[in-house]
């Protein structure tokens, strides 16, 4: 593989290093990391990072070096425009801050008549149009007309999970049992990248994955926190957590198959069917973080609960998981603090209305969430 291919990874945290950085370096690409966190940048500049790969057959560790590192606070438009692929690996709520920078890069590519692929790695759905428009706002009329000829913005489904003690940690674990999925690229060839497959059906599959995999995962995290556990591994073995999460998984699968008129084979495409030989140690706080986003109407727990309500299915497990999410407290998590503050001052019903967009048409679901919230709080 020639080293002429260059990927810029915007966000050098767990996934940025442990999945994207490692696999593109393995394939012989030039890899540049960009981040806003000084500790992340300084650690990477000091040498190398290591990834412990957990596959169904073996666990092995590999060290990586020979990459570039850049501070997003500096003027990085010049090095960034050398990339023919840009991977966005930041929190969804922070992506808008990249629009001016990506606009500069797109402007340069259009002037040079060079192709650029922008890959968006986030669990949030339906972002591609807004990201594309956000970038195009920094282009003139002629450049906007030429945009699609040279620039493509593609969605991705994150299935390859990673874990580290922090975003700045240089030792990362990667669960390499199922490939992540990216919308098929037209302008760059990434077929030699391990752990990634391309598909024309990402939009539909991403929603399915969010509900059927991330939903039960969140249920394990919030129930595990309630039980005083620290790792997802502990939660997966806890009877209380199992009851909630497996109930969420069973009902979610049923209502999603019915709502989208799917076959079970469709779900198999995004399921984690293989187990790692040695499971990675994952923290509950990593999975439970940002509860405002994860308790939103179109996200992993609330929407399947609404579908269950509409379809006449049992929504008790989802209601309990949502109640447990409302009980999640983390002094280092801004969203958790905001949610708890609003709950304290406005009550559960108003909180669900504001953050989960539940209204009088969902009254039975709201009542059930309130019931579980009050019962769980008593027993805490």
Across the structure, where does each feature detected by a protein language model lie?
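Substrate/ligand-engaging "lid" and interaction regions
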Residues: 2-8, 14-380
